[in-house]
Amino acid sequence: MSKIIPNIVVSMPTQLFTLRRKFQACSNGKIYIGKSNTDPTIPTNQIQVYIENEDGSTVPVAQPIMINHAGFPVYNGQIAKFVTVESHSMAVYDSDGAQQFYFADILKYGPNRFKEQAAQYIAYIEKLKGTTTQTTGDSTTDVMSQKACTDTFAEKNSKEPLKAGRLNLESSNGDTIFNLGGTDGSAGSEFAYVKNSKRTQIYDTATQTTLLFPQKNGTLAVEEDTYTKTEVDAKINSVKWTTNKLENGWMKDPNTGIIIQWGSVYKTDRSRKLFPMAFPNTLAGMGLANFNYDDTLSEMYAPNIMSADKVGFKMRQSLVTDGYKDSPLTDMRWIAIGW
């Protein structure tokens, strides 16, 4: 008698569908099949479903797939085996139209995706035939030397993680570049060893800036790219005070936003005056003084602010001491600060 090797389990080819919260057949329910990670109840997302016959032939069927009273999927009242040719999403609804289950992707890898990745792995194995691995002395550090891999192949296919204590790479164009960007091709940083100039640099492709590491004995100096006069002037101008040097003028600090303004008002002018520049946020305060050219005046006047806001103000002079009243009023000077 020959030795029997059992390797096939006798089981039902059809799946029993039950309710989510209790072990009961999902009677008169419906099954929808669609593209992975989509809503299969939407017709545009649905994919073709087939009935697989005993002889292996298939027959396309329409959706939704009905569930009988016992909980089995049926076609024209007959229990059948339903299949698809690719991974799919599946939604199960009960007889009242309530969703019982939803699966975004039935298979972790669809047949087509597995075929594509298998082809890449085979290509990796073929390229690794030209590699050698050795041990450095008593250390457990491995040295991996790759000479059979072209630049084009390495650029397109080096997405898998590589673990090695030391990695020797030789580039045909003289520059060895490690691209630290995203696997989807998004911009990132490049760590490059420039062979001709004997220096190491890090280049950020997102901001287009370069950090250079020149070779130094004992001390590593990090230097920035040389700026042109135009670039230096632009940096200085971005932080220095701006000003309008007129009789009624202003100056502004770009770092803090503080604004200082000044001006004069004619002797007896009590009309509303506008600041040379309106304060964007607030008027913090004002200082006032008379500008007197004649120290023999027999009358003294003091300037006063009648009203003021971010845009303008009113001011006047008031008599402080009595005298012979034979001297004219003097011009009024003011200074304001705000931001």
Swiss-Prot record:
It comes from the Viruses. InterPro entries: Gp53-like_C, P22_tailspike_N, P22_tailspike_N_sf. The keyword Zinc does not apply. It is found in: Virion. GO terms for cellular component: virus tail, fiber. Keywords: Viral tail fiber protein, Viral tail protein, Virion. It holds the Pfam family Head_binding. To phage P22 head-binding domain. Putative tail fiber protein. This is Putative tail fiber protein gp36. It comes from Acyrthosiphon pisum secondary endosymbiont phage 1.
